[in-house]
Amino acid sequence: MIALILFPLILLTVLVSLLYWKQDQVVKELLQTLNDDFAGHFEIKESHISPFENFPYISIDIEDMVLYENESKEGVHILDVHDTYIGFNIWDILYGDMEIKSILLNDGSINLVQHKDGSFNITDALATKVEIEDPTKEFHLNLKSINLADIDINKLNESNGMYFDLFINEAKSNFKTVADDVQMFLDSKFIVTYIDNGDTTFIHDKHLDVHTEIDYIAKKDILKIVPSEIALEGSVFNMEGNIDFADDMFLDINFKGEKPNFDLLIAFAPEEIAPTLKAYNNRGNVFFNGSILGKSINGHTPNIDAVFGCTEAFIENTSNDKKL
């Protein structure tokens, strides 16, 4: 009985010791490979073993990972993450196989900039200096999951001042490979803000929950979003569509929503007036149809269309019993 209890503890100790012994070599090789292969410049502060943070994987915690657009390190960083956990399978470690199975980014920021010529700072940074025949072998990757926690992603378009801010409270994704195609299952909670050339829009501090499956079709270089659910400020929408990477990231995404009250409209209302709208009793057949269609990179901006409708509606002011 005592042996059965002690065996898992002894095994875990052995595995952590093996990873501790190899961590410096793993991190050094990874950092050198990244800087040798890509135009951008990566830096880290230090690393240590974290057995349980990314369980069931045993992880190396890379502290304060930073990515700059180029080796001169001019301008704002692209990536600055306090903790980057790279996870390894327990049994793989025993056999000396150090493939990275999981990545967890915790507490940081990603700053994306679309330059006036249409290029992105991140694509410039990840432009390869040498030909990479197989990225999975080059970086010892066999990813099964990528997770984010408390990551602030923002995107600025220098030509028109459009600015998006996406604060990810939590995002969990799992991968399954079928031939050359990849299925990804995503659950996430985040807050989104959109600023148009310095002016705040109605999309400000909106809370979204996304539950979706995304399929990447390798031969066509297309990302397919299967029918999924999005919750915006508590109102549920359906979403589906495609992203064609080969055609300047052509977006063809559709949204639909229906409610027996005005919750759909309130979900899109500016933050300062939403509490006032919620104070009224309301009812009606409210629907929303939205779409994003068109190329989205290299100087292109997709068309965004939204249509609201309502039938058999009424609004009641509970303070004076007046109805509209």
Where do the language-model regions lie?
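Secondary-structure transition motifs
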Residues: G40, Y57-S59, E63-D181, N197, ...
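Transmembrane beta-strand segments that form the barrel wall of outer-membrane beta-barrel proteins
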Residues: I151, D221-E229
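Short beta-strand segments that buttress and anchor functional surface loops
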Residues: D64-L67, V226-L232
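N-terminal type II signal-anchor transmembrane helix
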Residues: M1-A39
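Solvent-exposed loop/turn segments connecting transmembrane beta-strands
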Residues: A231-V236, N317-N320
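Beta-propeller and related beta-repeat scaffolds in trafficking/envelope systems
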Residues: V76-L79, D181-Q183, D187-D221, I266-N285, ...
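Short extracytoplasmic
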Residues: D36-I60
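Outer-membrane beta-barrel proteins
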Residues: I90-L94, I292-I297
